[in-house]
Amino acid sequence: MKNLRKFPLVNLFNNYMIDAPEPSNINYFWNFGSLLATVLGIQILSGIFLAMFYTPHFDLAFLSVEHIMREVNYGWLIRYMHATGASFFFAFLYLHIARGLFYGSYRRPRTLTWTIGTAIFFLTILTAFLGYTLPNSQTSYWGATVITNLVSSIPFIGHDLVEFLWGGFNVNNATLNRFFSLHYLLPFIISALAIMHMIALHTNGSSNPLGITGNLDRIPMSPHYLIKDLVTIFLFFIIFSIIIFYFPTILSDADNAVPADPMKTPMSIVPEWYLLPFYAILRSIPNKLFGVIAMFFAIFILFFLPLLDFNYIRGNKFQPIGKLLFWCFISNFILLMFIGAKHVEIPYVAIGTYATLFYFAYFVFFIPLSSLISNTLLDLNQKSNSITK
């Protein structure tokens, strides 16, 4: 084994996957990184095989998808793997972000790791939207029309930008070609960012549930955490297989099986479940331009999170106020997901507006307030102890 470590690639693999020192107390919430890497590999491989048979043409895109499902050997399996894999990727991504929020993984010295991760999150949302439009079904066509039309809210140049995106005066053949090219390219950029994310992580090491620097109590990644990762990966494949073989369309819309009809608007235009919270934020603001700004800021605000949290204690494990606010935020995020799937009518509009206000208030107001209260109490306690002594 020592001789093999002389090879640069083997040595690199050994440093990152075998001998990497990890805190001895991390739990299963730290397994989502390996799960995300697994699902990303599935998405790239299944996407490459789908691209071999998909035709990015307005009149042929839907037919090519049907050809994959009906005539390509195991084409149905590849497509369902790709569609279901997208849902799993976002589920793991949201859980990964939630773990980072709860345990303060965005704090120094891991700010760069968090920043790269947020960039991955944004590109993943963009990639998912582009893939959503490619089947050219009734929902994907009108979804592409509505979302790309949001660019027209930009003053002076909005309408020109929309026509530039479309390559014409509506969603057409040029649009599908552009979206297909970008959808094929972006996963490789995400993979490169994921490697950068891992390099930045290993520079300072993983965080831990206690929120303290655990350099004095670390153990090698193999076999301890390597086996632990494999356990959750095997569990994922079991659940993944059950959904693919028994409930492959459980998360899809019925209009996805209908070809695009530019002359007929569907009853409701609803994106995939993992985009619903941001869709709800978009719809909660009547003004088109401000709605678009709010939707993008809901993602980009994660970049500023390290600046908004100035608490002496990293994470919420030992902070009752921070813990309560965190679970309120999670409940609010699930509520936004629910509201995004509903029609624009009373009482969903009002609920969506209040949920959107709380979403931004959590980052801009409640996190700094929680930090201020916690720091004040710690300072008062320290002063009282010094006086007592």
UniProtKB/Swiss-Prot annotation:
Residues binding a ubiquinone are H202
Membrane topology reported for the UniProt record: Multi-pass membrane protein
Say which species the protein is native to. Schizosaccharomyces japonicus
Which residues make up the binding site for heme b b562? Answer: H82, H183
The note on the cofactor says:
Binds 2 heme b groups non-covalently.
Q: What else is known?
A: Heme 1 (or BL or b562) is low-potential and absorbs at about 562 nm, and heme 2 (or BH or b566) is high-potential and absorbs at about 566 nm.
Q: What is its main location?
A: mitochondrion
InterPro entries, alphabetized: Cyt_b/b6_C, Cyt_b/b6_C_sf, Cyt_b/b6_N, Cytb/b6-like_sf, Cytochrome_b, Cytochrome_b_C_euk/bac, Cytochrome_b_N_euk/bac, Di-haem_cyt_TM
Any single Pfam family the record assigns to this protein: Cytochrom_B_C
Q: Which PROSITE patterns match?
A: CYTB_CTER, CYTB_NTER
Q: Which GO terms describe its cellular component?
A: mitochondrial inner membrane; respiratory chain complex III
Subunit note: Fungal cytochrome b-c1 complex contains 10 subunits; 3 respiratory subunits, 2 core proteins and 5 low-molecular weight proteins. Cytochrome b-c1 complex is a homodimer.
Enumerate the Gene Ontology biological process terms: mitochondrial electron transport, ubiquinol to cytochrome c
Q: Can you tell me which family this protein belongs to?
A: Belongs to the cytochrome b family.
Keyword tags: Electron transport, Heme, Iron, Membrane, Metal-binding, Mitochondrion, Mitochondrion inner membrane, Respiratory chain, Transmembrane, Transmembrane helix, Transport, Ubiquinone
- Keyword Mitochondrion recorded: yes
Q: What is this protein called?
A: Cytochrome b
Q: Where does heme b b566 bind?
A: H96, H197
> Which cofactors does it use?
heme b
